[in-house]
């Protein structure tokens, strides 16, 4: 297949599997066993190499059961901020790391910069140590570090400046690992992050965060800022239903660290995380 045809296939796949999402209310997810043969998930680089070249300003979300890539347009407005949720241990941090590493594979540091705020910066150390990766990161900070507050303030200032037509530059992918930790932060960082969740995309700042599903029903102030939900294993049907998304049925059969479900424009579809 020629490069042109491969690119056309990649774009068509993106449009079919992850169209812009216009609302949070969804239909019933299809969590039944795949009818097609499940293809073993390769590494991120192997998946992307199969369909090069990829459109810039994208990242990999996962792969379908047949191995077709599941892509996200980092600048797509209607998908809004992304919330990765599920039970503890379902793979939320791994999911954010897949987004980060695939962003590095697809985009240059001049196109996309990645910033991370997390409970445990050591979980991200291996990515930073890979050759050439550090150029893509503007910082990885623990919630307890002053750097986290400084980062949020800098991004809010950048967003406001870009809203006035100043300081164009790289798209920023802000990954917030374990969002509930912000509940203990001071007002300044909470207010700044909330602004970024609601307004960041208008200024080229894409936010994706993770939160245990059990905390979602009692924190609508934060959860309501997200438009796209990537849902991992939730053992309790009651917890899954309490997310308030129409059509979210049982997710207890999703494989921890491997499988998630997302709305794709017509229904909820299961996908798998690649190895990074």
Model-assigned labels for residue ranges:
Residues 5-20, 38-234, 238, 251, ...:
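P-loop NTPase catalytic phosphate-binding loop
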């Amino acid at each position: 297949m020629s490069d042109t045809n491969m690119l056309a296939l990649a774009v068509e796949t993106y449009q079919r599997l992850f169209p812009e999402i216009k609302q949070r209310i969804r239909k019933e997810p299809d969590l039944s066993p795949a009818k097609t043969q499940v293809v073993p998930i390769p590494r991120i680089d192997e998946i992307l190499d199969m369909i090069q070249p990829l459109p810039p300003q994208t990242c990999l979300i996962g792969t379908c059961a047949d191995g077709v890539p599941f892509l996200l347009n980092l600048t797509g407005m209607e998908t809004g901020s992304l919330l990765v949720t599920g039970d503890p241990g379902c793979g939320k941090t791994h999911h954010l790391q897949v987004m980060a590493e695939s962003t590095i594979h697809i985009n240059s540091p001049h196109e996309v910069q990645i910033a991370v705020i997390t409970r445990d910066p050591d979980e991200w150390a291996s990515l930073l140590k890979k050759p050439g990766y550090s150029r893509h990161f503007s910082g990885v900070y623990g919630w307890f570090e002053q750097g986290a507050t400084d980062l949020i303030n800098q991004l809010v200032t950048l967003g406001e400046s870009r809203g006035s037509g100043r300081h164009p530059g790289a798209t920023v992918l802000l990954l917030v690992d374990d969002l509930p930790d912000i509940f203990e932060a001071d007002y300044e960082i909470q207010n700044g992050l909330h602004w970024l969740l609601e307004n960041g995309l208008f200024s080229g700042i894409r936010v994706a965060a993770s939160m245990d599903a059990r905390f979602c029903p009692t924190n609508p102030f934060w959860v309501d800022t997200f438009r796209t939900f990537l849902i991992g294993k939730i053992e309790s049907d009651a917890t899954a239903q309490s997310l308030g998304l129409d059509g979210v049925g049982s997710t207890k059969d999703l494989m921890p660290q491997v499988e998630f479900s997302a709305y794709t424009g017509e229904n909820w579809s299961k996908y798998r995380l690649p190895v990074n």
